[in-house]
Amino acid sequence: MDIKAMFMESPFVYGMAVFGKWFTDREEDAKRLSANFTHGINTILISPRRWGKTSLVLKVAKQVSNKNLKIVNLDIFSCRSREDFYRIFAKEIILQTSNKWEEWSENARHFLSALTPTISLGNDPVNDFNVSFSVSNKILLNDEVLNLPVKIANKKGIRIVVCIDEFQQIMEFQDPKNFQKQLRSVWQLQTQCVSYCLYGSKKHLMHALFSKQSMPFYKFGDVFFLQKISLDYWITFIQQRFEETGKFISADLATQICERVENHSSYVQQLSWLVWSKTEKEATEIDFNDAQIDLLNQNSMLYHSYIEGLTALQLNFLHAIADGIQDRFSRKEIISKYNLGTSANISRMKKSLEQKELIDIAPEMITFNDPIFRIWFKKFVPILYQ
């Protein structure tokens, strides 16, 4: 069964990008992103994992795309080196700026002729088309590939927006700051016909890439911190999806779903689905409670992997955050209650847990990145005493 057919049978969708009637709110976000795409403004989109970044980008890309404006989407999560990046970048630019597979090989050889590219094209052109390079001149490789969008845009008389998901992955490359400098030096000269939308799921790394004055991408474009969808929109969305499938859920129960998962987009959809699947005609408190148990059970193995390797002090620090402690962790009563050792441990634990993507540190708030993990953690993981 294809994805669209599956969507027709499911009132709620999670774990993948959503579209159409499964996409709710983000109206102001979509307007801002649409204006940036249309007017050639570079965009940096930052938020924790599974808040709907990819869905938003794909929605806006579909809305603004036309014969004069091409949107290229690529995901670099699998890239482990600059060479991986160059291959994926070149491949997707070529694939997504032409509707005719016959042009792909021709364009690769024409626009990348200085690199003598190797083209492979199998029985399935879309999935089997690949570009590779055997050039030893790294500067030439960098310049030729990164300028590919400009060359194509100029030849076709169009504008191109290149959207790169999991952009923080470049921090894992060898000599990452040098690579960032190379990207910035080329991309900042392409403003006439090419712009970029850079986004990723590791908020602390994305923030470090774009918000620190010492980093090459500082002030590269419009830094866009995505917020959670508001409760009112979610309530309406949940009730409509139930109604359209011949079922009913009260505004109060829809509110409980949202509040339980702290308006986390993916979990609102998942918990709503679990409640819906248990509902005969009208959703009840029993359906809601049973769905919560299922949600914890479905994620239990994942949460066990989260805590593997954590020290007793780190686990105890998570307990403090789970109980709503936001600051002043060095107070004697907090250190004593949660067995945090010494005050010198606090900053190290915060940094370590943020790097592991378990917590989100805002100026006045520290929270769990995953609200259901917080519930599971409080329920199943005890405070450890030495």
Where do the model's predicted regions map?
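A short, basic N-terminal segment
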Residues: M1-T43, P48, D360, I372, ...
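P-loop NTPase nucleotide-binding core
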Residues: I41-N42, I46-W51, S55-V161, I170, ...
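Short regulatory helix/loop adjacent to the ATP-binding pocket of P-loop NTPases
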Residues: K203-G221
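Amphipathic alpha-helical "lid/sensor" segments that cap RecA-like P-loop NTPase cores
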Residues: I235-M301, P363
